Amino acid sequence: MKKIKPAAGDYAPYAEQYVVLVAGDDILEALKTQLKQTATIFSARSERDGNFRYAPEKWSVKEVLGHVADTERIFAYRALRIARGDETPLAGFEQDDYVRAARFADRKLADIVEEYEDVRQSSLALFRSLDEEAWKRRGTASGKSVTVLALAYLIAGHELHHRKIIEERYFPAIPRA
């Protein structure tokens, strides 16, 4: 795969906030590095930390990580469909409904970390399998045009966005026992 960042027209305007967070132009390396970093960050936290919310209406740490894994799974599925030449417009999803239905609070943080790792390994396997043409393919997701390359960057940038929120708003606010 040629190392290049997606162009602004390769994704919806709202997605710029995620794409700009990804440093460099080697998306496979960025995804691999994130896998190690994110697993380390969350594995170091207690179950109590996993249940923490910095405000009553906000997701818990577990719910944020679960949301990151669910969103990656959806974006990778979109990338697979588009990479294989499927031109069917792909529907959006309501993130709050997914988080509510997932019941992450009923699961152990370590299990959610493991699921995140499995999802990322699966995404990496998919992206490593693609040829140049597949990376360039364009489809429609949530009513917007997107390329396979852009979806890989959205996975990485979306995770960085949420990790930043966790590190800035959640972890500093967790009361020490």
Language-model segments: residues:
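Amphipathic, non-membrane alpha-helical segments in soluble helical-bundle scaffolds
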Residues: G24-K32, K58, K62-L65, L109-V113, ...
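A general boundary/transition motif marking the beginning of the first structured unit of a protein
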Residues: K2-P6, V19, D26-I27, H67, ...
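Short amphipathic alpha-helical segments at helix-loop
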Residues: V19-A23, S60, A101-K108, G143-T147
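Acidic/histidine-rich alpha-helical segments that form the ligand environment
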Residues: A30-S43, D97-K136
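Short, contiguous, helix-prone interaction/anchoring segments in small proteins
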Residues: V20-Y54
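Short, contiguous alpha-helical
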Residues: M1-D10, A15-Q17, G50-Q95, Q121-L124, ...
